[in-house]
Amino acid sequence: MKRFFLAMTASLCCVALFAQEKDHNPSDLKQRNDSLLMAHLDIIEQQEIPLDTTVRQGVLKNGLTYYVRRCTQSDKKVDFTFLVKGGCIIEKDNERGVAHFVEHMMFKGTKHFPGQETIAFMGRCGLKFGHDSNAFTDYTNVRYLLNSMPNDELVVDSCLLLMRDWACDATMDNKDIESERNVIVEEWRGRTSKAYQMSIVNEILNTPCYVDWTPIGDMDVVKNCSPKTIRDFYKRWYQPQNQAVVVVGDIDADEVVAKIKKLFGNLKRGKNVVPPSPALHDEESPRIRFFSNATSPYHFSAMMMRLPADDAAKENTVGALRSEQVYNHLSGLMLNQLNGMKDKNIVYAASAMAKPVEVKGIETMIFELGSKPDDWKKALEKLAKRVEYLRRNGFTDDDKVKFAEHPKYNDDFTAIDFADTTAVDKVGARSSWTTLITNSFFHGTKLLDMKSTEASREHIRSTITKEQLSDAFRKLVNGRNMAIVETFPEGVAFPTEKEVADILKRVKQMKDEELAEATVEAPKKLESLHVDSVDINPTPGTIRKTTVLNDSISEVLLSNGVKVVFWKKKLHHNGVKMKLDRPMGYSALSDEDFQYSKMLSCRRKYKYQASTHAFVLARPFDDVFDLFCSSAEKDEAYWTDIEQALKMFYASLTTTEVDSVAASEIITTCQNAATQSSVASVQANNRIYCLPFESSKRLMPPTVEEAGRLSVERLRELVKDYYSNFNGTLFLVCGDVNQDSIMPLVLKYIGSLPSKPEPVKRHLWGADHYKTTNTTAVEKFSNPSPLCVTALYYTWEKGFQLNQDVRALNHALQSVLGELLLNRIRVQHGDVYTPVCQVVDDLLPVPRMRCAISYTCNPTQRERIAQDVKQLVNEMAEGNLITQELVDNYIKNRESARKPYEDGVDGPCSDYIERELNGIVLKNDDLTCDKKVTPSSLKAHLKQLLKKGNLHVGYLTTE
């Protein structure tokens, strides 16, 4: 049989080669190649993916695993990762939460980084500490991250030394352990708002070691376990045979490997090997479960399924990737199917894959429809009918998305032609390599060549068949390891299991004709029109005034009030950048019509050059539109291209033809969002957010009544008025183009834009101003545990002047205040998990700034903690808390985060317009001004904020 198959393959190849000599029609050639490819699928599936040869990996005599990969990127940074097998599932009953507790203690002092030196070292390297950005504990592992560190040799050595300390030399003083207990409690408190989501995940895991244990642990254990219990857990499991060191970045791999061997080689091998992760419990029939959600007014019907294990293909082969890609594709197909079922009763649809626990082979898929609570039966039945119909009948060619990309194959299409990527530094980003390596260590999988793996995935995606999709779907929805989850708003009574089961049973008994949804042709959105297909022949405007500013720049004021700026500047490929900015934006809409701001782009769109699409972008205080033209030669085609671009400007700016289908979709989305926002807890949260503002009308979502009044008819009225005046608009033409030659076209298409006697202007509303008196507000909400979300807003508007130096001071204030808050109310007092500090400033609509501090805490301590925060801010302004080291850390962080500047035309053109319209250009990454910040200048800036601004304190609390 094998010989016959090989002979048949050879014959096919000969036929194909002969045909290629005779006929070179590309379409026929592609068809023949596709036929050959499908004939050889079984052979390609067995092809082994080459192992990676670029990662230096090994295991020391003591059992510690290391991975080092040189990976050059423009930022020249290095990512360090310390991995430990065994998360919360290896805890004993009296240790629930200790694995996570140990993770916290790694930042409270080690042998070579005592006290707070670990956090201080990270700060000096520009790395922020807090939340899960530096470490996190999972069910089966713990990870410590030192990402984007400088490739300085001293920093590299220090990072390796810190990871060595984490491996065996954490100090864990009794005093530090006691101070960290409440921090963990506060972290747990902040997560309880998502408790119902965790309960839903547990239904999929359905295994005691995962359901009964959670990484954050039991708070009774966290509060009362002895320091000895914590230290014993650390010594028992933090042993070399359970650990790995990963270094990826701009380093010399050989040098780093040598340093790892020297630094970690003398650690003693332990006796405690983390056992394999327990297998999940299997259920042969679906389970029906009910949950309450206090954050949504909607009901959700969901089918949650654990993906079947796939043991058919040999690991490390191309075929081993097929199941993964089939299910990924299946998820996308189901999203399309469910989205097509949305109507007045079904307001939400979702299809997604998830990995609830970091265990190899455990993945889930969810299909979900949302409705109003009274329509729960309709939602469940619709979902069940669609799933049952597809289970019986499978997918069609129309359902399957076509993938155009194929990898390269060998000449006879019997194998993928894998490119040689040996020792290629620039293949893949640091994060991609770290993820690949981490999975290899925890799951025991081999490291495969990254480019070859992606080529294999391309092959799989391009050869997925409807039969494979249908078979995978049937296995997925056969009822095994499936949960039917019905989630209702808090306070709504659950139906019975029998009611749900009866609906599912009735659907199973339906005939195909009953299962098939009546197909109604969806209304179509307006098609984009080519500008040459539209009669565009406006009456040209005239020149009112010409001003020559210098040899490169001249300004021309047109009769309709548009100012045209010609900037003679040589761009690549004879490029011409044209950019229009109207200084109005949707600030012109009244409070009552503000919700239509999201629909102003729902108009007929135009294109030129067959593929160039663009639309007017309505922003809060500007309406912008820009295009770029280029040509190898300044010939007739060059000028045709420029005229078509200018036609695009005219057509796009003047059309009032509303796309009613697109607008209706946004209106429906807005109405659903209004219903979602009607929940008491959401409204309370929004009121706290709006506390500093004079008015919340343009900041809060619309009410259900307001959203119900939205209409396409009113949008049409607004669009006609909104695009009726371009007096005061700036139009920039940048490029090496002759002004006299292009002027007639500019007069015809820009000079003819509609205008009114008065130029446009930016409007101010109540929501654009901060309150001028201090305020305090308390809002109540429900939560499974006592919780208070506190927000302190320091605002300054009257007398505030914004320039680049002030922006640098605001950036520094955010960094320094954030560090001091972390040190004071988390590290020293243990009152909160991680406070967040954000400083924002605005030039428009009025110069102003806001310093927002937020955190979660125990409701009974909210006033005391808020007073501590206020006292800290006052001490910063009056004392010596702002040190040079804190400012230096801020500057290093700015340098680390700054992206390399890419020369181009967009930046200079935007700067010119911003300077012309706003009088100043403000950058977010001006290191020159950042480096001018000093402790004294920052202190003086904060004093002004406290003296001239106001303070607004909001508590969102359960009691």
PLM regions and their residue ranges:
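Hydrophobic alpha-helical membrane context
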Residues: 14-15, 112, 198-199
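Charge-rich, well-structured scaffold segments of protease-associated domains
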Residues: 20-36, 59, 120-274, 301, ...
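His/Glu-rich zincin catalytic helix
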Residues: 5, 20-120, 158-161, 165, ...
